[in-house]
Amino acid sequence: MQAEPQKTWTIGALVKWATDDFRARGIENPRLDAEVLVAFALGIDRTRVIIESLRPLEPAELALLRDLVKRRRSREPIAYLRGEREFYGRPFRVDSRVLIPRPDTETLVDVALARTAHVSLSMRLLDLCTGSGCVAITLARQRPTSKVLASDVSPDALAVARENAYRLGAYNVAFVESDLFANIPAGSRFDVITANPPYIATAEIEGLAADIRDYEPRGALDGGADGLDFVRKIVDVAPAFLDDGGVLAIEIGAGEAPDTRALFEARGYVDIEVERDYGKIERVVSGIRPRG
């Protein structure tokens, strides 16, 4: 009896198989995920995935793709599988040591740039909870004559951020391991302080999508009982590190704007503003340093 011939997998067949598999497992955007993984594995863009759909896959390519599909089945984020995520038009290296940069956080960059448009070219900026460094590095590249200090409590996160700064040519960024302001040099003054702190309420962590809950660093997510533990500390201490007229801008979670605004008001900040993200959710609260 003759052996049955082995199936020849084409790019198109693999995309369909992965799409059907992801859809059956309840993964959002199954077709997009399949195309992105195939494009990444083959080193081509998504357009070529469609154009070359009839091209047979080499055994090594098929093996790599099957491994990627298996990992995605387990909800490992696409950004970790690719090792990269775009932010503000730049490719940032990411892995499980850091939170994945999201489009919502681009709002934080926009607010910082808009509220410091009047500041001299030698702007001094502090970015707390920097993670991958996406905010600090983006601001450094957008304002190349500025001086940026990026801090994080995690040495692992700082290693990723340093690599991103080097790869993206952000040579005006310095890094410090610090639990919020703990290791920021006394007497330092900044024109703007940005922060994307953990802001998800502890009780809500288990209800997050598996991609987030099971893979992204919990320390970068858990903001305490009401999600505002870190926000309170930052709002309270930041004036000691802001120059006259300096701006504090903090990213927050959905529904947290009223309480965060109240914290700013109670601490005496002025010109308080709330900015919405691309999804029209109140995402960033900012204010000017209180006098005195």
Residue spans for each PLM region:
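Conserved SAM/SAH cofactor-binding pocket of Class I
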Residues: 103-207, 255
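Conserved Class I SAM-dependent methyltransferase catalytic core
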Residues: 225-288
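Conserved hydrophobic residues forming the short capping helix/wall of the S-adenosyl-L-methionine
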Residues: 22, 116, 165, 238, ...
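Mobile active-site "lid"/loop adjacent to the S-adenosyl-L-methionine
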Residues: 199-230
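Short loop/edge segments at beta-strand edges and connector loops
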Residues: 82, 177-178, 252, 276
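Residue-level signal for inorganic ion chemistry
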Residues: 37, 75, 105, 135, ...
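Non-catalytic nucleic-acid substrate-recognition regions in nucleic-acid-modifying enzymes
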Residues: 1-30
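Conserved AdoMet
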Residues: 2, 31, 36-115
